[in-house]
Amino acid sequence: MILDAETHEQVAAVHRILRGVEGLALPGRVKTELFASVFETNTFVCATAAEVDAALPALRRAAAEAAAAEGLAIAAAATHPFARPEAQPIVKEERYVTFVGYGGISVRRQGVQGLHVHVGMPSPEDCWRCLDAVAPWLPLVLALSANSPWFGGELTGMASNRAPILAELPRAGTPPPFRSYGEWEAWVERLVRIGVLEDYTRIWWDVRPHPALGTLEVRMPDQPTDVRLSAAFAALVQALCATALDGGARGGSPRPDYVQNRWSAARFGVRAKLIHPDGSSFLPATELAAELLELVAPAAARLGSAKLLARIDPSGCEADMQLEAASPQEAAAGLVARSVA
């Protein structure tokens, strides 16, 4: 998010940020998003989570320096504590203007930011097998990453208010239980053929195949403020996918369990109680987090990312830090202070 350095109000200055980083040798790119007061950072393809850990801070520092040169600041979180997203100008690009025309207020409310992690897949069917295996664990990932308790100047009572706002969109939130990649592909092709979708990128589930990139895209985490946590959650997602591909992360719970867990994780963060991915028990998120970290530990060791996973604290999430603020203005100031290491 792009903020006034003094008031911490959002500022529609994305093109000023883009000009400020133009020509720099960066490990990725800085680009526009729906709102002109927000920018997106994408790393280039990384072979390891350690590469992500180097690339993301470099991208964020470059954007912060470009902002400072304009008398601005940046802040990373899943929502701005007091700005109203409906009041934010839209980037005047055809895809965004069309999107707002299609979705109306449900799109104008999408002043929310998340962390998206792409993991390369061996084949389309492996991608779908991996999706089915990792999906039951994703509400726990939301609980651990929850970072949006404020919205429009109010405490929402949610650890992640981003999650229910995202779910206001069609084809968002919980992924439906297709039986195979081929079944999903046929559904997408039918919706494109009859004019519902332009392509599969108009599907915004918490996890989705991305055939053009050959990846499984996990979109569940709230945007971390601490950039080191971004790399940690990327490492967690990679290790979970690797474990699933090895047959070690089988989740047998039905999709209604996912819906329940998604809401509980959004509401309570790490203090949620969640249905176990195998459907056998109802337990604190902290206990389930310990089980998940143990489950993915062999894959993380093999991938060289064990130290990154150690950054994840199963007993707390960044929403807790925001809740220590006495006002939304104080919360915004804290985000600015913590966003650039």
Model-derived features: where do they sit?
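Metal-dependent DNA replication initiation modules
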Residues: 77, 81, 94-115, 119-122, ...
